[in-house]
């Protein structure tokens, strides 16, 4: 299990933010994932989790899926998302993401949220593009590596060379 480093200020990932989700992203070779169970503080008027929170989780995972496969810092350009079933509070789910394909300019990726039985509750496909003027070292220098392995730290240090 390879826990990925997190951006220290991330609402979704930081383990230090009291108001955040404190997700841990795991690198599994051909995909990334996170297990989560979110409480009522993010419950909508329909007694399910806000779709914006769900998209945010999938967007973060897509960013990591791209980073791990291409070593590129990318930004979301276009999304196609489906919310198939409501996601309940205080129930365990797993969100996954994997790279579909990448060429010189366009990077296509997908993510989805499923329950313990593999039923998919929401899914997204997206087009990402490499961020212009973005410096990988500026981002990576703001990562928290406290839960990563030395090998994962070494992988991310290779971005700085």
Give a label for each model feature:
Residues 1-40, 140-161:
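Non-catalytic linker/capping segments at the edges of enzyme domains
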Residues 20, 76-78, 108:
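Short coil/loop residues immediately preceding or within conserved phosphate-binding loops
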Residues 26-28, 98-102:
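Short beta-strand micro-motifs enriched in acidic
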Residues 36-38, 83, 130:
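Hydrophobic residues in beta-strands and at strand termini
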Residues 1-4, 87-89, 100-161:
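HotDog/MaoC-like acyl-thioester-processing domains
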Residues 60-94, 99-100, 125:
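Hydrophobic beta-strand-centered segment that forms part of the acyl-chain substrate-binding groove
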Residues 33, 38-57:
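A conserved, well-ordered hydrophobic junction motif at loop->secondary-structure transitions
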